[in-house]
Swiss-Prot record:
Coiled coil: none annotated. Its main location: secreted. GO terms for molecular function: metal ion binding; monooxygenase activity. Residues 1-17 form the signal peptide. It comes from the Eukaryota. Disulfide bonds join C66-C185. This is AA9 family lytic polysaccharide monooxygenase AA9-X282. The modification Phosphoserine is found at S43, S49, S58, S130. O2 binds at H171, Q180.
Length: 275
């Protein structure tokens, strides 16, 4: 009964707590929404088989392409409402706990590429870095004013890419179709002279509705959490800061936070995700 009450409360709160990825930073420089395909609304996708899972449901087109180099620090930024970048409001609220994931896909033209036809490789993720107490990837966003920072792999081939930032909210994921997927696609051009072509997956296709990281009751005690999708390209498992959330986590090799932030960053400063 207690679990049912929690789930019911989460459903009620979720109506006002949806969110979208809206802005991009490159090496600490704010690009705003200049190269993002902004979703039509902040409502989630709930099917793992719909083409909308790639870049959201009929997002607004963009003719902007942001320029990045291999090794650049890229920050995706999420907020509940369009044009509201206030740090006073949670990036995604209503107990929308779950992982944050970032994918990339090489495409011929980032402004016209169809996300559901692209081939994606994961470059960063954060799930449940602490289970005592529970501390989710979405809380990293909330503690960093909606920011999550990763590095562009240092060896990928130059050209146009889509960057897909995603949150999977698990507050009502104890039944099939309950998980909520929030994603946006950013359009970038990667420079340099790399040649790597990482292993890829299709989206949709990378997830199953019964994956243990998608069909899950997060209100039961959890000691571990399996992040959906493939392993991030070029990963390692370093020890992370031992206070206040002692744990280890799988990260993109390029970016390891040296400390756990203790305060919410002020607007205008991209935060680096905690582990």
């Amino acid at each position: 009964m207690f679990t049912k009450l929690i789930i019911a409360a989460s459903l009620a709160a979720s109506v006002a707590a949806h969110a979208t990825f809206q802005e991009l930073w490159i090496n600490g420089v704010d690009q705003g929404s200049s190269c993002v395909r902004l979703p039509q609304s902040n409502s989630p996708v709930t099917s793992v088989s719909t083409p909308d899972l790639a870049c959201n449901a009929s997002p607004h087109p963009s003719d902007g392409i942001c320029q990045v180099m291999p090794g650049d620090e890229v920050t995706v930024e999420m907020h509940q409402q369009p044009n509201d970048r206030s740090c006073a409001t949670e990036a995604i609220g209503g107990d929308h706990y779950g992982p944050v994931l970032v994918y990339m896909a090489k495409v011929d033209d980032a402004t016209t590429a169809v996300g559901s036809s692209a081939q994606w490789f994961k470059v960063a993720e954060i799930g449940l870095p602490s289970s005592n107490p529970d501390y989710w990837g979405t809380e990293v966003l909330n503690d960093n004013c909606g920011h999550y920072t990763f590095k562009v792999p240092s060896d990928i081939a130059p050209g146009n890419y889509l960057i897909r930032a995603e949150v999977i909210a698990l507050h009502v994921a104890s039944s099939i179709g309950g998980a909520q997927f929030y994603m946006s696609c950013y359009q970038v051009n990667v420079g340099g002279s790399g040649s790597a072509n990482p292993p890829t997956v299709s989206i949709p296709g990378a997830y199953s509705a019964t994956d243990p990281g998608i069909l899950i009751n997060i209100y039961e005690p959890l000691s571990t959490y399996t992040i959906p999708g493939p392993t991030p390209y070029a990963t390692t498992s370093p020890a992370v800061a031992n206070t206040p959330y002692p744990t280890t986590a799988t990260w993109n090799t390029a970016l390891q936070p040296s400390t756990v932030p203790t305060a919410v960053p002020t607007p205008g400063t991209p935060g680096i995700g905690k582990a």
